[in-house]
């Protein structure tokens, strides 16, 4: 089934890929992305681990409706999460290149 040293090579490749994935996950956790809403009036910056790092609210919104401001904050956060997930997918593509993964399979992180 496995050629001479085939199983050993397979295990070695799996370990190398696991090491690369762990390193990439650590790098991704340090990256920051900013989501926006209200044409940039609300900005939320999160890191790759989806921890909120900064919230910026244009002063003109402080006089507006509280409900609208809450909606803009939620939309900016959701935009930041979407951007972080896209960035993670791009970064992990280099690690998983050549692997036959089923469609929609999400790598663990």
Curated annotation (Swiss-Prot):
> GO molecular function of the protein, one example?
DNA binding
Q: Is DNA-binding among this UniProt entry's keywords?
A: yes
One GO cellular component this record assigns the protein to is: bacterial nucleoid
List keywords of the entry alphabetically: Cytoplasm, DNA-binding
Q: Which residues cross the membrane?
A: none
The subcellular location is:
Cytoplasm, Nucleoid
Q: Which InterPro entries match?
A: YbaB-like_sf (IPR036894), YbaB/EbfC (IPR004401)
What SUPFAM superfamilies does the record tag this protein with? YbaB-like (SSF82607)
Domain of life the protein comes from: Bacteria
Q: What Pfam families does this protein map onto?
A: YbaB_DNA_bd (PF02575)
Supply the NCBIfam families for this chain.
DNA_YbaB_EbfC (TIGR00103)
Q: State its role.
A: Binds to DNA and alters its conformation. May be involved in regulation of gene expression, nucleoid organization and DNA protection.
Q: Which family does it belong to?
A: Belongs to the YbaB/EbfC family.
Q: How does it assemble?
A: Homodimer.
Q: What is the name attached to this protein's record? A: Nucleoid-associated protein PM0205
Organism lineage reads as:
Bacteria, Pseudomonadati, Pseudomonadota, Gammaproteobacteria, Pasteurellales
